[in-house]
Amino acid sequence: MSANTTTESFDCVVVGGGPAGTTAAQRLAQEGRSVLLLDKPGKIKPCGGAIPPKAINDFNIPDSQLVCKVAGARVISPKGRNVDMPIDDGFVGMVDRKDFDPWLRNRAALMGASYREGAYQGLERGTDGVPVLSYRPMGPEDGRNAPEVKVRAHMVIGA
């Protein structure tokens, strides 16, 4: 692939718009890097949604994103035995990932990252050695018939 067959170039492409990917995209954008955040729409991984107070503070997560604050947990075995576990630091904030993840992606975009919905297709090196990532845009349609898009990126993060 020649270096001029793609129209866009980014310092970094982050594949995956969950908490890790959006945090990476946001931090890089805040540092002035050009960032593309690519995420496949409509896919939320199974997750309990628990966020400890230190992470809430460190990542500036507003109370509006918390569904509730939990002060303890109980595990019940198949035989009916209970184990109660108090939570250190008083509580754990709970989020609903179907609302929380889009909020994180929007925050990364507000900080300067470009956000696109699409399905990762592959990664290769251009003739100049710079990685070229390909993806299929997705949105109202499922993306199967969308033409593949190729972008250059000096760094790719799989999140």
Put a short name on every predicted segment.
Residues 4-18:
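Beta1/beta-strand and adjacent pyrophosphate-binding region of the FAD-binding site
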Residues 7, 81-84, 143-150:
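Short, mixed charged/polar active-site loops
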Residues 13, 17, 26-47:
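Glycine-rich FAD pyrophosphate-binding loop
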Residues 17, 27, 31, 107-159:
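Predominantly flavin-linked oxidoreductase catalytic cores and closely associated redox partners
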Residues 21:
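N-terminal Rossmann-fold NAD(P) dinucleotide-binding loop
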Residues 47-53:
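N-terminal beta-loop-helix "entrance" segment that forms/cooperates
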Residues 54-110, 117-118, 122-125:
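A conserved beta-strand/loop capping segment in the N-terminal third of enzymes
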